[in-house]
Amino acid sequence: METVNIMIVGVGGQGSLLASKMLGHLLVNAGYDVKVSEVHGMSQRGGSVVTYVRFGDKVYSPIIDKGEADFIVSFELLEAARWIEYLKPSGRVVTNTQQMEPMPVIAGLAEYPENLVEKMRAKGVQVDAMDCLALAEEAGSAKAVNMVLMGRLSHYFPNIPLEAWHASLEANVPAKVVELNHKAFALGQKG
């Protein structure tokens, strides 16, 4: 199997690191060689958080270069656009449509770009966009955006049984919120 490259991007505090941990756990248990690498930047101050998850028969490096990502899983819309150059031509963006204003926008020095999904699609990018925040809140907590996105991502890996996704979820989230996260995952699957 060729190496599959997944970038998980978001803003600090959104749960992207838990999502990458769950994904890595899932893929190791599915029998793949897996490499995970995290880049935090100014994540504690609302800055970008990027995680690379690579899996296949044999993976030699945890880093994804520009033009190599099969998937960009984005917790925030501008982050999807910011990292788009890492997507390969046949790749896909799976993104939350939530918009979190970066500091230059908050300070009035810039405007949040409009119509980002349409702009990416106009460039030929395959974009699977949904309001993950609304679905997470429907499941019971805004903090479950990560599991909504993981549920949506599972749609693109039909060879990995849903039971394996759920087992990885249970192994990586606190017991008191497992049921809520299962609901969020299921809502993400439905899209």
Briefly describe each language-model feature range.
Residues 1-191:
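Active-site cofactor/cluster-binding pocket
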